[in-house]
């Protein structure tokens, strides 16, 4: 199955590098108990309005750039999206305990709070650059959602996030349809895990809005060689509806700049989701290049057309909207 376009991969690869630097810089190699988190007086996620956010994406790989970036986010965003990979070994036995991974994640969340930012969490068991792979599984672990170790660590990590950070919105995997396409024999195992963990979350935090994200362009069979013979622009609704009735909102990612110029985007490319569900919708990841990259032609006007399409087609029911980057990276 084909992966996402090179520009998207480049942006996400650098974002992952930045996240690793942030974890290392903020934690200073220490582990210890996670202290209680300050609550925002008026959290954006409780406003009842569409909220806007970004991935953490400082322009330079320096601590000063990270600190400055969070200050900028505090001015321009309502929230930051944290999409950490699961620290498998730290959580296979229990949700409780102390570890460097817990401290690292908590320090990032604290920095967000200090800058007046709400946060949304997405639990991510897979490789962000290749959704056919698990990320950093311990040696000897079977890469399958049927594996009891995988299921235990996934569950315990998710419950730790719920108990520690109390997020209003919580995702239980990203772009999961790409994994389901690659490993249809394992799809039912993830679906059952999702339903199990959803139930556990609701017992502890019934107001938490739980979802899983779907790669919209792939769901619409727009990738050449990755459609498995399915018709373009005919969404694979069965992949979303396998998670019902336990989707509190329908959430997508989309990078359409390599499929069609912004001006030629179908008028109902996104809005067709509104006709399929009465639930709120959200964009958990996305972007559109403003210049030609790797053989893909794009302009600032195309980027504006993409933003306008999201706004006009989904705006009436949009719970939150994440654009991948607040700023370009300084690659020097």
Residue spans for each PLM region:
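Short, well-ordered coil/turn segments that N-cap beta-strands
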Residues: 46-50, 76-78, 115-119, 166-168, ...
